[in-house]
Curated annotation (Swiss-Prot):
GO terms for biological process: regulation of DNA-templated transcription. InterPro entries: Helicase_ATP-bd (IPR014001), Helicase_C-like (IPR001650), Helicase_RapA (IPR023949), P-loop_NTPase (IPR027417), RapA_C (IPR022737), SNF2-like_sf (IPR038718), SNF2/RAD54-like_C (IPR049730), SNF2_N (IPR000330). It comes from Histophilus somni (strain 2336). Interacts with the RNAP. Has a higher affinity for the core RNAP than for the holoenzyme. Its ATPase activity is stimulated by binding to RNAP. This is RNA polymerase-associated protein RapA. Gene3D superfamilies: 2.30.30.140, 2.30.30.930, 3.30.360.80, 6.10.140.1500, 6.10.140.2230, P-loop containing nucleotide triphosphate hydrolases, Tandem AAA-ATPase domain. ATP binds at D176, E177, V178, G179, L180, G181, K182, T183. The gene is rapA. The lineage of its organism: Bacteria, Pseudomonadati, Pseudomonadota, Gammaproteobacteria, Pasteurellales. It comes from the Bacteria.
Length: 966
C-alpha cells in the first residue's frame, strides 16, 4: 500500500469510525485519525485493514461545510486526490482537496462498497441472502408468536392464542379450569401482539403474591423482560432534579404490579390511568367483587383502566365457579355497551338452553328431533340449513354426516352469544389428564407436641389455626428445639424418599421456616440431596433451586417448598407430592396439587398427606377427601361449599368432640354431588368446542411440531454464529454454550449476555431444564441475529470465482438482490402481505436474467472464494461493465417487483375483505361483534391498499462472479 499524509481511507473492520485521514507514517507503521469518532489508530504497514477512498466521475460527495456536489473530474497530485465538483445547491464548479471531504461517511449502497473495495467474503453474501429469505418467511408464517414459547404444544392453548392474538385490540375472558394454562394462553396472545407490533405498552395487574410468578413466567417462557413496579420504585420519580414530577408508568413499556397496591395508592392508580397502555392483563379477575349497587374499589379501578386501554385480557375462574352475576360483571368490564344490564343478560342466557340441547344431540350423533331442528333453524335463520339437516337424519354414510354436523357446529360457534369474548376449557372437555391417587398416612402425635399444646392451652397462648402446625407450637416454648428429631412425619418422609430413589418428590409446607428446617433434617439424617424454595429467596435463588430439582443426574431428589413460594411454579416432571401441611381452603389445595397436575403431566400423581391421629389436620383431610373428593378430582365447587360450610367445619376442627362430624361429611358429599350434577348439566358444549379448537387446533400443534423437528433453524443459526464470531461450545445432550468474543464482526450481539448463555433447539429439553434458553425463529437471539445481518452491511458486496470448463475464462456474471418493501405504521402489520422480500437477479454480460435457469444453491455449489487482492483487481478492471449491468438490472427488476406488489395487494384485499364480510354477517346474529372492530378493519384495508400501492424496491446486495477453468 502507498500511503501519503492527507489521504482519505476507511477502516475495513470498523466502518463506524467514519472517513479517516493519514496523519503519520514510518518504516513499519501508519497512523490514521478518524475525526468523526475522535479516534486514532496505528496499523502495521504490511497489514493495515484500510481501503483507499477515491471517488469517480458522477459520484456524489459531501464537503466538511455540509454542502453536496457531483464529481466532474479527478486529478492525482503527489498521491493526493483533487476533485473538480459541481455544487448541487448553486451549480458552481469548484476544486476540492480530499482533505476537505466530510468526515462522516459510510458506504451502505452495495455498489459503493464494491467500488471502494469494501468486499465481503463470499460466505457473508450467502448468509445475508439466507437471512433475507428467512426474514420473509417468518414475517408471513402463521406460526409466528405461537412456536417460540417454552411450553408444550397443547392444541387448545394454541387455538385460543391464535384466535385472539390475530385480532385488533382483543378484549376477552380466559376462563379455563385450573391447570389448563391460562397464563400461557395470555403470554402467547401477548407475544403475537408484540411481534405483530399491534401493541407496545403492556400493564399486567396481579395479586401481590403472584407478581414474581408472572415476572418469571414472562421471562422464562416468552423472553419478555417486564419491570416490577411497587411504591419503592415509583417513589424515585416523586422528587426529580428538575422539580417536574414524572409519571413512573411511562418509564417502561412492559410493567407488572399488584392490583391491591394501586387500590391503596390512588396517586399511582391515577398515573397508571395516564400511562397510555395498549394492552391490559388482569389475573385472578374473579376476585374483583361486584354488585349492581356497590362494586368494589378494585373493580372500579379495572373498569376505568379498561375504558382507556384498547386491548384487555381477563384471566378468571370458570363461569360455573363465579356464578352468573359475577360472570356478567367480568363481561361488563370487556364491553359495557353490550353487557349493560344483568337482567337482560340473564334473559339472553336462558335463550341458549334449547341450543345447548341441540348441540348435545349433534355431538352425540343422535337423530335430531323436530324441536331441535327448529331451534337450530331459528338460530341460523340467515342461512338455509335444511340440506344439512336432511343429511344428518338420512341414511347417508358416516363421513357425509360428520361433514354436515361439522358445518352446523362451525356456524353455531361463530354465532354463539359470548363465543368471541369468552374462552373456557374444562378438564372433561380437554381430557388426557392422569389420575390422582390419595395416600393418607396416619401417625401418632408425639408426647412432646401434646405436652406443649396442653401447657399453652392452659396459659391461653394458643390460637385455633396454630393447632394445624404442632411443630410451631412446640417451638413457642423453646425456640432452639429441633422438633424434626422426634417428629414421626420426618422419619416417614425419609423412608418414602429412600423407597423412591429414582423419583422426584415435591414437599409443600405452610411456611418457609418449616421448609428450611426439613431440608436440614434430610441432609443431616440421611444426606439426601434436596433444595428449598420459598418466598424469602430471590428470583435467581429460586431459579437455581428449580434447576437443581429438575436435573436428572446429580440433581436434588426432593424440593421443599413453602405454599407461597411454590405459587406459579410447575414441576410436571415429578409425580409425587407430599403435603406436609394442608392448606386451609379447597382452592389453595388445588393450587398445591396443580404444581404437578397440569397439562403435560404424563403419569398418575401420588398425593401423600401425613397427619396426626385425632387432630384438626386429619379431620380437615377427611373433609377434603370424603366430603369434596378434592384430592383425587378437581373440585370446581370447592370454594362455594367451603363458603357455605366453613363456619361449621371450623367448629369441628377446633372442638375436642367429633360427634356428628361423619354426618357433616356426608352432608357435604351430597351437596358436592348435587353441585357437580348441576355443573355437568349446565356445561356449555358449544363454548367448549369454540374454546378447544377441535381438529384445526390439533393440526396447528402438528405444524409446530414439524417445524421443531426441522434442522433448518439449527443450520442457519450455527452458521450465523460462526460468521459473526460467536464462540460455541457443544455440551452434548442437545445443548451448546454461546458466548460473545472480542473478534466478532459486530461490537454487540443484542440478547447475548457477556458471560454467555446455554441454549437448546429441543423443546422437550427446554421444558425439563429452565436454565437453558430455547432457540426458535421467534427467540430474540435469532431475530436479533437476522436483524444484525439484514440491517447492517455484512455481505452487501462480494466477489467469487466460478469454476466451469464450459465457459470462457473471465466470463462476467452479476448476481443482484433487490428488496421489495412497503413503509407503513407498525400496527397495520403489512408484513403479513408484503414483508421485505428479496428478489434475485443473475445477469450475464448482455444483461440477460439467468436466475430462473440457475438457482442460488445450484450456483453456490460451483463457486470458490477469491482473494482480496485479486478481487480488487477484478473490480477495477471490470468496473465499467459492472456499472452497466447495475443500470440494466434497474430495468429488469421492474416487472417482477410490480408483480410481487400486485400479489400482496390482492392478498391484503382478499384477507381483510373476507374478515370484514364475515363480521358483517355475524353482527346480524351476534351482538358481540363490536361496530368499532369492523370500522377499524375497513380503515385498515383502505390504508393498507394505499400503502402497498406505494411500495418500492432497492438494491440490497450484489456479487460479482468471474469464471475460470479450474
Amino acid at each position: 500500500m502507498l500511503f501519503a499524509i492527507g489521504q482519505r481511507w476507511i477502516s475495513e473492520s470498523e466502518n463506524s469510525l467514519g472517513l479517516g485521514i493519514i496523519t503519520g507514517q514510518d518504516n513499519r507503521t501508519v497512523t490514521i485519525s478518524f475525526p468523526a469518532s475522535d479516534e486514532i489508530r496505528i496499523y502495521a504497514l504490511a497489514s493495515a485493514p484500510l481501503t483507499r477512498v477515491l471517488f469517480q466521475k458522477g459520484d456524489e460527495i459531501t464537503h466538511q461545510l455540509g454542502w453536496k456536489a457531483k464529481v466532474v473530474d479527478v486529478m492525482i497530485r503527489n498521491e493526493l486526490a483533487f476533485y473538480l465538483v459541481q455544487r448541487l445547491d448553486n451549480n458552481e464548479e469548484i476544486a476540492v482537496q480530499e482533505m476537505e471531504l466530510a468526515h462522516q461517511i459510510s458506504f451502505s449502497k452495495p455498489q459503493d462498497r464494491l467500488f471502494s473495495t469494501q468486499i465481503d467474503r463470499n460466505e457473508h453474501f450467502v448468509l445475508r441472502y439466507k437471512a433475507l429469505k428467512h426474514q420473509q418467511e417468518q414475517f408471513q408464517s402463521s406460526l409466528r408468536g405461537l412456536r417460540g414459547n417454552r411450553a408444550g404444544l397443547i392444541p387448545h392453548q394454541l387455538h385460543i392464542a391464535q384466535e385472539v392474538g390475530r385480532r385488533i385490540a382483543p378484549r376477552v375472558l380466559l376462563a379455563d379450569e385450573v391447570g389448563l394454562g391460562k397464563t400461557i394462553e395470555a403470554g402467547m396472545i401477548l407475544q403475537q401482539q408484540l411481534l405483530a407490533e399491534k401493541v407496545q405498552r403492556v400493564l399486567i395487574l396481579v395479586p401481590e403474591t403472584l407478581q414474581h410468578q408472572w415476572l418469571v413466567e414472562m421471562l422464562r417462557r416468552f423472553n419478555l423482560h417486564f419491570s416490577l413496579f411497587d411504591e419503592e420504585r415509583c417513589a424515585d420519580f416523586d422528587n426529580p432534579e428538575d422539580h417536574v414530577e414524572a409519571n413512573p408508568f411511562v418509564a417502561e413499556n412492559l410493567i407488572i404490579c399488584a392490583l391491591d397496591w394501586l387500590v391503596q395508592q390512588p396517586k399511582r392508580a391515577k398515573q397508571a390511568l395516564a400511562g397510555e397502555f395498549d394492552l391490559l392483563i388482569v389475573d385472578e379477575a374473579h376476585h374483583l367483587t361486584w354488585s349492581e349497587d356497590s362494586p368494589s374499589i378494585a373493580y372500579e379501578l379495572v373498569m376505568q383502566l379498561s375504558a382507556v386501554i384498547p386491548a384487555v385480557l381477563l384471566l378468571t375462574a370458570t363461569p360455573e365457579q363465579l356464578g352468573q352475576q359475577s360472570h356478567f360483571a367480568r363481561l361488563h368490564l370487556l364491553d359495557p355497551n353490550r353487557f349493560y344490564s344483568y337482567r337482560a343478560f340473564e334473559k339472553e342466557q336462558q335463550q341458549y338452553q334449547p341450543v345447548a340441547k341441540a348441540v348435545q344431540s349433534l355431538l352425540s350423533e343422535h337423530i335430531l328431533t323436530v324441536e331441535e331442528q327448529n331451534h337450530l333453524a331459528e338460530l341460523l335463520s340467515e342461512q338455509d340449513i335444511e340440506p344439512m339437516l336432511k343429511v344428518i337424519n338420512s341414511q347417508a354414510d358416516t363421513e357425509q354426516k360428520q361433514v354436515a354436523r361439522g358445518e352446523l357446529m362451525s356456524n353455531l360457534i361463530d354465532r354463539h352469544g359470548t363465543g368471541r369474548l369468552l374462552f373456557r376449557n374444562t378438564r372433561q372437555g380437554v381430557q388426557g389428564f392422569p389420575h390422582r391417587i390419595y395416600h393418607q398416612i396416619k401417625l401418632d402425635l408425639p408426647t412432646q407436641y401434646q405436652n406443649a399444646i396442653n401447657v399453652l392451652k392452659m396459659l391461653g397462648e394458643i390460637k385455633d389455626p396454630e393447632l394445624f402446625y404442632p411443630e410451631q407450637i412446640f417451638q413457642k416454648m423453646n425456640a432452639d428445639a429441633t422438633w424434626w428429631r422426634f417428629d414421626p412425619r420426618v422419619d416417614w418422609l425419609i423412608h418414602l424418599v429412600k423407597s423412591l430413589r429414582e423419583e422426584k418428590i415435591l414437599v409443600i409446607c405452610q411456611d418457609a421456616i418449616t421448609a428450611t428446617q426439613l431440608e436440614q433434617a434430610l441432609r443431616e439424617k440421611e444426606g439426601i440431596r434436596s433444595a428449598v424454595f420459598h418466598e424469602n429467596m430471590s428470583i435467581i435463588e429460586r431459579d437455581r433451586a428449580s434447576a437443581y430439582f429438575a436435573q436428572q443426574e446429580e440433581g436434588a431428589q426432593v424440593l421443599l417448598s413453602s405454599s407461597i413460594g411454590s405459587e406459579g411454579r410447575n414441576f410436571q416432571f415429578a409425580c409425587h407430592l407430599v403435603l406436609f401441611h394442608l392448606p386451609n381452603n379447597p382452592d389453595l389445595l388445588e393450587q398445591c396439587i396443580g404444581r404437578l397436575d397440569r397439562i403435560g403431566q404424563r403419569r398418575d400423581i401420588q398425593i401423600y398427606v401425613p397427619c396426626f391421629a385425632d387432630t384438626p389436620q386429619i379431620r380437615l383431610a377427611q373433609w377434603y377427601h370424603e366430603g369434596l373428593n378434592a384430592f383425587e378430582e378437581t373440585c370446581p365447587m370447592g370454594a362455594i361449599l367451603h363458603e357455605k360450610c366453613g363456619a361449621k367445619l371450623t367448629e369441628f376442627l377446633t372442638s375436642d368432640t367429633t360427634d356428628d362430624f361423619q354426618s357433616f361429611i356426608q352432608q357435604t358429599h351430597q351437596q358436592q354431588l348435587q353441585l357437580k350434577s348441576e355443573l355437568e348439566q349446565g356445561r356449555d358444549r358449544l363454548l367448549e368446542l369454540n374454546s378447544n379448537g377441535g381438529i384445526q387446533a390439533q393440526q396447528l400443534a402438528n405444524d409446530i411440531a414439524i417445524q421443531d423437528g426441522s434442522t433448518e433453524l439449527i443450520d442457519f443459526t450455527l452458521n450465523l454464529f460462526d460468521i459473526i464470531g460467536v464462540e460455541q461450545e457443544d455440551l452434548g445432550e442437545k445443548s451448546i454454550v454461546i458466548s460473545p468474543t472480542g473478534t466478532m464482526l459486530v461490537p454487540d450481539f443484542p440478547g447475548l449476555k457477556e458471560e454467555g448463555v446455554t441454549v437448546t433447539f429441543d423443546r422437550d429439553l427446554a421444558l425439563a431444564r429452565e436454565e437453558l434458553e430455547f432457540l426458535t425463529w421467534d427467540h430474540p437471539i435469532v431475530r436479533n441475529g437476522i436483524d444484525l445481518i439484514v440491517s447492517g452491511d455484512i455481505g452487501k458486496s462480494a466477489v467469487a470465482l466460478l469454476v466451469n470448463k464450459q465457459l470462457p475464462t473471465g466470463t462476467l456474471l452479476l448476481e443482484l438482490v433487490y428488496i421489495i418493501e412497503s413503509q407503513s405504521p407498525r400496527g397495520l402489520q403489512l408484513t403479513r402481505f408484503l414483508p421485505p422480500t428479496p428478489l434475485r437477479l443473475l445477469l450475464d454480460i448482455k444483461g440477460n436474467d439467468l436466475s430462473h435457469q440457475i438457482s442460488f444453491q445450484g450456483l453456490q455449489k460451483q463457486l470458490k472464494p477469491m482473494g482480496k487482492n485479486m478481487a480488487t483487481k477484478v473490480i477495477k478492471i471490470m468496473r465499467p461493465a459492472i456499472e452497466q449491468l447495475i443500470k440494466q438490472s434497474e430495468k429488469n427488476v421492474v416487472e417482477p417487483a410490480k408483480m410481487i406488489i400486485e400479489q400482496a395487494k390482492q392478498l391484503a384485499d382478499q384477507s381483510l375483505s373476507a374478515e370484514i364480510n364475515r363480521l358483517y354477517a355475524l353482527q346480524a346474529v351476534n351482538k358481540n361483534i363490536r361496530p368499532e372492530e369492523i370500522e377499524q378493519l375497513e380503515s385498515q384495508r383502505t390504508l393498507s391498499l394505499e400503502l402497498l400501492n406505494q411500495a418500492n424496491w432497492r438494491l440490497d446486495s450484489l456479487r460479482v462472479i468471474v469464471s475460470n477453468k479450474e
